[in-house]
Regions:
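Membrane-targeting and insertion segments and their boundary/processing signals
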Residues: 1-19, 30-34, 86-97, 137, ...
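Juxtamembrane/interface alpha-helical elements of multi-pass membrane proteins
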Residues: 2-76
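Arginine residue identity/basic-tract feature
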Residues: 6, 29-31, 40, 52, ...
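Sparse, context-dependent recognition of short Cys/His-centered cofactor- or disulfide-binding micro-motifs
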Residues: 13, 20-23, 34, 44, ...
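Generic structural signal for well-ordered, non-membrane alpha-helices
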Residues: 36, 40-43, 95-99, 118-121, ...
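Glycine- and small-hydrophobic-enriched helix-loop-helix hairpins
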Residues: 45-48, 53-110, 114-117
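Membrane-interface, cytosolic juxtamembrane amphipathic helix immediately N-terminal to a transmembrane helix
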Residues: 105-148
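Juxtamembrane "helix exit" motif at the C-terminal ends of alpha-helical transmembrane segments
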Residues: 149-157
Length: 157
């Protein structure tokens, strides 16, 4: 009886190691998804500003109506200039992109188009870095978590 309980405990410890690795991988995936959605948001805002010269309130209404960016919590946003950090995005990445929203609408014409293009490139670079991190995490974290869990189980057993 005692051996079965110990074996079950060891299996639970090994599983918790794997689950921790999976959770860390999932966190990287959600960060990548948030950056992809932000990149899409910036591209859509740029198109609306450049081609239609739409006001920011109309752009926000259009983005809310799309409902294909759930990770950005656009429903809670009253004005596009007050958009805050999405929950799945880390603070350093947001600090690099926050200027897009705070300065949005402060310039006109070509200056606004350059502003959008700059942040679109910056977001693309962040997304590419996040994609590489996610690919590495996918290959490493769950396996390393399982190995650490098994090692901890062996030490306890």
């Amino acid at each position: 009886m005692s051996a079965a309980v110990r074996l079950l405990g060891a299996a639970l410890v090994a599983f918790s190691g794997w689950a921790t690795g999976w959770w860390l991988t999932e966190k990287k995936r959600r960060r990548l998804a948030a950056l992809e959605q932000l990149e899409r948001l910036i591209a859509l805002a740029q198109d609306e500003i450049v081609y239609r010269a739409a006001p920011l309130s109309e752009i926000l209404a259009l983005l809310k109506a799309r409902r294909d960016m759930p990770g950005l919590c656009l429903e809670e946003c009253g004005q596009l200039e007050e958009f805050s950090c999405p929950p799945d995005l880390d603070r350093p990445a947001w600090d690099q992109l926050e200027g897009f929203f705070t300065r949005l609408g402060s310039a006109a014409g070509q200056e606004e188009a350059r502003h959008c293009a700059y942040y679109l490139k910056r977001c693309a670079l962040l997304r590419e870095g996040a994609r590489q991190e996610y690919e590495q995490a996918k290959q490493l974290y769950t396996k390393a978590g399982l190995c650490c869990g098994v090692l901890a189980a062996l030490m306890l057993f």
